[in-house]
A protein has these predicted regions:
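Active-site-proximal alpha-helix that buttresses catalytic centers in soluble enzyme cores
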Residues: 2-24, 30, 34, 38-132, ...
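Short beta-strand segments
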Residues: 138-140
Length: 194
């Protein structure tokens, strides 16, 4: 028997072994892909609470702003129905950090500070770096509408960031992105809008 004939005879014996192995590897790769990409990302964007009038530049929160911010951690825990916040970002001013602090304390998170130049491209970084996670971003009247529009494609729906409104952008993969507005503040004033 020639050497080529022996090789041909050996190949059919490998097929019953290799074919199931390839099927298992392909299925495992598919499950891994689905597990890492087919998740829903939730980005909650809100403006810092009310700031004091003085000092100009980088003021602390006003007493009303402190009261509004104080309940944010519990409000988000209720809104997420016992879920968790995975990442927390805030602008690098005192008013943004003071608004984020109750959220950080409630969920045991560090506050990742965003310098002025870091807001550009933030939406795409949130989508790619935090897929399948829940992220809270505390911004400014000038940054919240743009970030929401970039995340949700809803440019006309958020003309300016309002006090006591959390913009919830739900990004399912696959599926259509949705935008919700939640009001927060004193007890009894929370409500959802679509």
């Amino acid at each position: 028997m020639s050497e080529a004939a022996v090789r041909v005879r050996r190949r059919p014996h490998l097929a019953p072994i290799l074919l199931p192995l390839l099927v298992v590897l392909a299925a495992g790769a598919g499950v891994f892909w689905l597990g890492t990409s087919a998740r829903t990302t939730v980005v909650i964007v809100l403006k810092h609470a009310e700031a004091a009038a003085e000092p100009r530049g980088d003021p602390d929160l006003s007493p009303a702003g402190e009261a509004r911010a104080a309940g944010l951690g519990d409000f988000l825990a209720d809104a997420l129905a016992g879920g968790k916040v995975d990442y927390l970002y805030a602008g690098d001013t005192r008013r943004a950090q003071q608004t984020a602090l109750p959220i950080a304390n409630r969920f045991g998170l560090p506050v990742n500070l965003l310098a002025p130049g870091e807001w550009e491209g933030l939406a795409s970084r949130l989508r790619s770096d935090h897929r399948g996670r829940t992220i809270v971003v505390v911004g400014y009247p000038s940054t919240v509408p743009n970030l929401v529009a970039q995340l949700a494609g809803e440019a006309g729906r958020v003309s300016e960031a309002a006090d006591g409104v959390a913009y919830v952008v739900v990004i399912p993969i696959p599926g259509s992105t949705r935008l919700f507005q939640l009001r927060y503040g004193p007890p009894g004033q929370a409500r959802a809008q679509r």
